[in-house]
From Swiss-Prot:
Pfam families: Ribosomal_L11, Ribosomal_L11_N. One of its GO terms (molecular function) is structural constituent of ribosome. Keywords: Methylation, Ribonucleoprotein, Ribosomal protein, RNA-binding, rRNA-binding. Part of the ribosomal stalk of the 50S ribosomal subunit. Interacts with L10 and the large rRNA to form the base of the stalk. L10 forms an elongated spine to which L12 dimers bind in a sequential fashion forming a multimeric L10(L12)X complex. The keyword Ribonucleoprotein applies. Belongs to the universal ribosomal protein uL11 family. This is Large ribosomal subunit protein uL11. One of its GO terms (cellular component) is cytosolic large ribosomal subunit. Forms part of the ribosomal stalk which helps the ribosome interact with GTP-bound translation factors. PROSITE patterns: RIBOSOMAL_L11 (PS00359). The gene is rplK. NCBIfam families: L11_bact.
Length: 141
């Protein structure tokens, strides 16, 4: 019989830098997970993506064992990296802080495709463009 999932824990952790310190430690401690076991495994799996923030969904089972799924970095993080800025605009409709090209948007959409609820690349690109506009970025051809 399959193990029964007791709890789902969702976190966003910098790749290769999971530590038992907050926010990771307390979230996993409440779920009863072996914190060191998780941090070692997560850091090993994400070592090649250094510098990115990686969303992770941890399934905790009744016997306190766990497994986790890493997702692609958030679109906002990928857009900031592509545009070379630290953060988006505080007033996106008034102040534009950066410009991204359609080619960069397409590259980000291809990266995010497994995690997006999009039927094709074109609709995924529209989602990424919407995120860019809401951050105060201008999308150019």
């Amino acid at each position: 019989m399959a193990k029964k999932v007791e709890k789902l824990v969702k976190l966003q952790i910098p790749a290769g830098k999971a530590t038992p310190a907050p926010p990771v430690g307390p979230a996993l401690g409440q779920a009863g997970i072996n914190i060191m076991g998780f941090t070692k495994e997560f850091n090993a799996r994400t070592a090649d993506q250094a510098g990115m923030i990686i969303p992770v969904v941890i399934s905790v089972y009744e016997d306190k064992s766990f497994d986790f799924i890493t997702k692609t970095p958030p679109a906002a993080v990928l857009l900031k990296k592509a545009a070379g800025v630290e953060k988006g605009s505080g007033e996106p409709n008034k102040t534009k802080v950066a410009t991204v090209t359609r080619a960069q948007v397409q590259e980000i959409a291809e990266t995010k495709m497994p995690d997006l609820n999009a039927a094709n690349l074109e609709s995924a690109m529209r989602m990424i463009e919407g995120t860019a506009r809401s951050m105060g970025f201008t999308v150019t051809d």
